[in-house]
């Protein structure tokens, strides 16, 4: 059964959300310089690349990333392709697609994924995102996990309403997916965030099987 790695590679030249720290990988011990082993130090924000948001990210309620439920982060999911002319994942856009019944984990493949396929490293502000009415639609539909193929589920400069609507409803948010090589359909999702105590988010190695 094929395995799709939908995780962005963490590197110093990858795009990050404006104001977040850039990725820095520094070698602090080197065999070439007489050390017993090569050792590196990695610095970056917890919302870098492919990552999950904990409720504490926007709700300030101390529900942090190490407590996210593994039974939601893993299991059957549906990858939904949206046409390139879809500029926002609104309630109307969602009503227009034929989402199969019983889907509780939903990943959106939009034109954003073409940015990853092309190797675009500059942060893009006009990415396809989920406005508030789309988030409310997902909550009504019973979605437990939503994944998007850029660095935020929310529109740029209007990030709070969507995040709050989803996180208050207990929806796990998975951001920064590369779905450029994934066809529409059902898969098994395995999303394992770093277990960082007290954190509002964490990077997550994420794969699809199927």
Predicted features and spans:
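Active-/binding-site microenvironments in catalytic and ligand-binding cores
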Residues: 1-210
